[in-house]
Amino acid sequence: MKFSIAAAVVAFAASVAALPPAHDSQFAGNGVGNKGNSNVKFPVPENVTVKQASDKCGDQAQLSCCNKATYAGDTTTVDEGLLSGALSGLIGAGSGAEGLGLFDQCSKLDVAVLIGIQDLVNQKCKQNIACCQNSPSSADGNLIGVGLPCVALGSIL
């Protein structure tokens, strides 16, 4: 009996985790019609250049453009009973609704070498713009190459 309940819970968790992503435009990396992601929590002002943004990140972090952001915050869910809330993290409920931004699928934004070129950072990146800590690790999906800790640029401007 206990084994069948555990097997049912594991099967349900696997089916929820294997669901395809929603086709909603707010979750698209570059938005509908290449107009940017409407789900950017900390937007960067329109007049900020790539050089200004890179200077704000400092020499210990690199300016990055991130396709995916997960926000975890101040909400606390108290679940009671056997297996209550065991799958809430998989379905998007409970703790992790809003707040601290964890960024994924980031690529480095290069500062223009030529003096006089003032590219606006919002033209280079339509997604989440972040300052990611310099590290020799890689964020390629394996467990050893841990993703870099990043902070939204809009939250520190």
Swiss-Prot record:
PROSITE patterns: HYDROPHOBIN. Coiled coil: none annotated. One of its GO terms (molecular function) is structural constituent of cell wall. Glycans are attached at residue 47. It holds the Pfam family Hydrophobin. Induction: Expression is induced by the transcription factor brlA. Disulfide bonds join 57-131, 65-125, 66-106, 132-150. Its main location: secreted. Self-assembles to form functional amyloid fibrils called rodlets. Self-assembly into fibrillar rodlets occurs spontaneously at hydrophobic:hydrophilic interfaces and the rodlets further associate laterally to form amphipathic monolayers. Belongs to the fungal hydrophobin family. This is Class I hydrophobin rodA.
